[in-house]
């Protein structure tokens, strides 16, 4: 074998699938599987069998193409170690950097409000239905839970980072286990309700409107955009010097594809299992009660008459506990991102970017008071969580995940090779449909 053949063989071996690629695949997958998944079955199952089948067809393309577009934007910067803010500043100047900072902050902060409402409702339904205690004052419960989380975050952040990272996989395993364990309780209610003669494409409860609203919850639930920038930087530092940027882009796409397949498989199986166990009417009731599907399942099994199986008794208590842990995990992870983003905004606009004028401790205190205070107000007001996701959370995520990369592909010379592709049209349409939910909610 010649020397050149040996070099090619060595490079091929080194560039094949690595352990770090598997780690990142699981990391992206784990980032997306959080509390948002607990609301997807409610919205997906709300319209019955036909809409959720259409969502199943759309799920992987939405997850893969949208995140690949964001990854391509992150890859387009000249500095392999540059994050998305630096890349956007390189393409669009300082104004672009400010815009991306605002987008990141406002993409994450509403999620904290959503989780504040969710954890309050989940705790209250567990307190009243599973433990059998008298109802508590909502404002007190929300304040207690937020102060408890603030205390843990303030005094044990490093420990909680480790604990939360360990909880990702038990939570995913519990979702799969619950999905499998629900199979004996599946019924044909959702199939029996399918009447092809009375199906409507348009109208408030039509298939198109249901799928349109479902796209928003998919963008919200199938979202690992907060970690994409770090993921791309890691892969560029690992591959780009030896194998080039095109190879790195293909490797990132491959990892995103596998993570998306895992994510869609777990979430859609969980959604279908919940729908076949319950019914569209049950999903509508869960939406009205403003609780995650696990809490509704707990109440559903608690209300069962006759002899209960061990699983039914276990799920009656375990489902709400799993939901509480999942929400806390998601709240904590998003809190750190919100804190970092708000600190940057306060420093930039309150102290003109001069870090010597204010200590990190003071910045953290100012930001924590605003974050926890605003979250308490929203949790006390108790807006409908799915409406909040569709009107605020998902549209802001879509502007960052879908429309920003498409605008960059249109304007940035380094992304010119991606212009004129059908998947760009798909990503743009998904982004616009998600943002148009705001208009739909207003009217």
From Swiss-Prot:
Activation and inhibition: Inhibited by the proton ionophore carbonyl cyanide m-chlorophenylhydrazone (CCCP). Partially inhibited by the respiratory chain inhibitor KCN. Activity is Na(+) independent.
A GO CC term attached to the entry: plasma membrane
Family that this chain belongs to: Belongs to the amino acid/polyamine transporter 2 family. SdaC/TdcC subfamily.
Catalytic activity: L-threonine(in) + H(+)(in) = L-threonine(out) + H(+)(out); L-serine(in) + H(+)(in) = L-serine(out) + H(+)(out)
Main location: membrane
Species assigned in the record: Escherichia coli (strain K12)
Membrane-protein topology: Multi-pass membrane protein
Subcellular location: Cell inner membrane
Swiss-Prot/TrEMBL keywords: Amino-acid transport, Cell inner membrane, Cell membrane, Membrane, Symport, Transmembrane, Transmembrane helix, Transport
Biological processes per GO annotation: amino acid transport; L-serine transport; threonine transport
HAMAP family: Thr_Ser_transp_TdcC (MF_01583)
Listed GO MF terms: L-serine transmembrane transporter activity; L-threonine transmembrane transporter activity; solute:proton symporter activity; threonine efflux transmembrane transporter activity; transmembrane transporter activity
Role description: Involved in the import of threonine and serine into the cell, with the concomitant import of a proton (symport system).
Transmembrane segments: 22-42, 44-64, 97-117, 140-160, 163-183, 207-227, 261-281, 311-331, 366-386, 389-409, 423-443
Gene, per the UniProt record: tdcC
Domain of life: Bacteria
InterPro entries given in the database record: Amino_acid_transport_2, Hydroxy_aa_transpt, Thr/Ser_transpt_TdcC
Name of the molecule in the record: Threonine/serine transporter TdcC
Induction: Induced in amino acid-rich medium under anaerobic conditions.
């Amino acid at each position: 074998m010649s020397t050149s053949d040996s070099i090619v063989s060595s490079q091929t071996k080194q560039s094949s699938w690595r352990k770090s690629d598997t780690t990142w695949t699981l990391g992206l997958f784990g980032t997306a599987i959080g509390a948002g998944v607990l609301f997807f079955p409610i919205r997906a199952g709300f319209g019955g069998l036909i809409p959720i089948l259409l969502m199943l067809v759309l799920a992987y393309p939405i997850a893969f193409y949208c995140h690949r577009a964001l990854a391509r934007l992150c890859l387009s910067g000249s500095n392999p170690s540059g994050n998305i803010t630096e890349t956007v500043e390189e393409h669009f100047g300082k104004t672009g950097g400010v815009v991306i900072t605002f987008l990141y902050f406002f993409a994450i902060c509403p999620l904290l409000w959503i989780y504040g409402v969710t954890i309050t409702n989940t705790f209250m339904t567990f307190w009243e239905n599973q433990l059998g205690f008298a109802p508590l004052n909502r404002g007190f419960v929300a304040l207690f839970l937020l102060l408890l989380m603030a205390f843990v975050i303030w005094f044990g952040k490093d420990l909680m980072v480790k604990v939360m990272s360990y909880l990702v996989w038990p939570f995913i395993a519990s979702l799969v286990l619950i999905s499998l364990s629900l199979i004996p309780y599946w019924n044909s209610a959702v199939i029996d309700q399918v009447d092809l003669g009375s199906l409507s494409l348009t109208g408030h409860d039509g298939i198109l409107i249901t799928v349109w609203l479902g796209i928003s919850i998919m963008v919200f639930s199938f979202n690992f955009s907060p970690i994409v920038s770090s993921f791309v930087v890691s892969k560029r530092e690992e591959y780009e010097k030896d194998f080039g940027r095109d190879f790195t882009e293909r490797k990132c796409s491959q990892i995103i594809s596998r993570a998306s397949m895992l994510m869609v498989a777990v979430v859609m199986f969980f959604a279908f299992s919940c729908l076949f166990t319950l019914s569209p009417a049950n999903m509508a009731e869960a939406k009205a009660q403003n609780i995650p599907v696990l809490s509704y399942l707990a109440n559903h099994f608690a209300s069962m008459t006759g002899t209960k199986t061990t699983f039914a008794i276990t799920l009656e208590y375990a489902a709400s506990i799993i939901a509480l842990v999942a929400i806390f995990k998601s709240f904590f992870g998003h809190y750190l991102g919100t804190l970092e983003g708000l600190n940057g905004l306060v420093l930039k606009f309150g102290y003109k970017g001069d870090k010597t004028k204010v200590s990190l401790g003071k910045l953290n205190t100012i930001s924590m008071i605003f974050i926890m205070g605003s979250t308490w107000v929203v949790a006390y007001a108790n807006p409908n969580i799915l409406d909040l996701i569709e009107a605020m959370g998902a549209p802001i995520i879509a502007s960052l995940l879908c429309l920003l990369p498409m605008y960059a592909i249109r304007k940035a010379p380094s992304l010119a090779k991606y212009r004129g592709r059908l998947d760009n049209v798909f990503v743009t349409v998904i982004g616009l449909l998600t943002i148009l939910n705001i208009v739909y909610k207003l009217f």
